[in-house]
Amino acid sequence: MPTYNQLVRFGRKSKTRKTKSPALESNPFKSGVCLVVKTVTPKKPNSALRKIATVRLSNKRTVNAYIPGEKHSVKEHDRVLVRGGQVPDLPGVKYHIVLGAYDIAGVKGRKQGRSRYGTPRKQVAVTKK
């Protein structure tokens, strides 16, 4: 417990919160160039081959970003848009690639949750009477 005099001299320090995606520098998205596309295995007890890409962001930082969805069109030297968001079972992967932006196509054949996977709305044929 501080004394009254200590509070007058130093005041109360407010705690600073640590950001979960420091490479974005308080921006919602950052663009970058894909350097490597690879698969990694998740932590126990899960088992899979998760697709990730190493991306050099526009602020010269290099991050590992997760590629969501089934099948992807991410290749080396593609321009990508990166957002924050951790992958729970992949240590060190704190970012997601936004599908349907820049050089990356959306997931084909998706009917629900299309906006998350960059899938365009299916065109309905209109018949004239």
Curated annotation (Swiss-Prot):
Disulfide topology: none
Pfam families: Ribosom_S12_S23
Residues found modified as 3-methylthioaspartic acid: 89
Region (Disordered): 1-25, 109-129
GO cellular component: small ribosomal subunit
GO BP terms in the entry: translation
Compositional bias (Basic residues): 10-20
Alphabetical keyword list: Methylation, Ribonucleoprotein, Ribosomal protein, RNA-binding, rRNA-binding, tRNA-binding
SUPFAM superfamilies: Nucleic acid-binding proteins (SSF50249)
GO MF terms held by the record: rRNA binding; structural constituent of ribosome; tRNA binding
PROSITE patterns for the chain: RIBOSOMAL_S12
InterPro entries, sorted: NA-bd_OB-fold, Ribosomal_uS12, Ribosomal_uS12_bac
Subunit structure: Part of the 30S ribosomal subunit. Contacts proteins S8 and S17. May interact with IF1 in the 30S initiation complex.
Function: With S4 and S5 plays an important role in translational accuracy.
NCBIfam families in alphabetical order: rpsL_bact
UniProt record similarity statement: Belongs to the universal ribosomal protein uS12 family.
The protein's name in its UniProt record: Small ribosomal subunit protein uS12
Originating gene: rpsL
